[in-house]
Amino acid sequence: MYISKLYREEDRGKILEFLKQNEFATLVACDGEKPTASHLLMEVMEDGEQLFVNGHMSKANPLWKTFEKNAEVLVIFQGAHTYISPTWYNHVNVPTWNYQAVHVYGSPRIISDHDETYNLLEKLIERHEAGSQYRLKTLPQDFVEKEMRGIVAFQIEVTRIEANYKLSQNRDDEDYHNVIARLNERDDEMSHGVAEAMKRQRSSHSRDVTGTM
């Protein structure tokens, strides 16, 4: 994707944290004639320096059948995003939109092994049900097997990542902090999420005022 140099994020640790916090993502592939996509829970895993994205979908979803035609697929992770009013600056300007988005590219494979699929689902449930006693192994296993027959698990070996954090980095301190304050005056979670992302961004990067919009 197009990313202005000012907004390109390359810190691996920060990108991984973002991916893990925004794991409901969009998987995009091509069916041979046109793009096709699904919105899925996508879990990022590390194996040394190599990254993988694990997921599963309904067997009725035709997207998994495109994997044999796609040497590379795209997974889009989207963070908080919101409108930025030009009235928040101390000079004349135009409206814009702040957001964080990460595009992850990689080679997909279907997980056909039963035990590998079971372990993937087991770890996923353990992570999301950490505060409860609900576990895959405590369920009736005939029920689990029936449910597993209705899904297709997959893994994507990550080949490249593009991270775009457009968070008013082109603004001076006065405008930057005023944008944060105005966002926090709103009632919606998206605005508050962008405000928090801006706080983290300015604290971890030196100021860079270029006038890029």
Question: What spans do the regions from the language model cover?
Answer:
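A generic structural signal for short beta-strands and their flanking turns/coil linkers
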Residues: 23, 38, 49-53, 69-73, ...
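Short, structured beta-strand-loop surface elements
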Residues: 60-119
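C-terminal edge-of-domain segments
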Residues: 111-213
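Short, solvent-exposed cationic patches
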Residues: 1-7, 50-79, 134
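Residue-level recognition of well-ordered beta-strand positions that form the cores
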Residues: 41, 56, 76, 107, ...
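Short, intrinsically disordered, mixed-charge
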Residues: 20-21, 69, 75, 122-130
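Short, basic/aromatic recognition patches
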Residues: 2-26
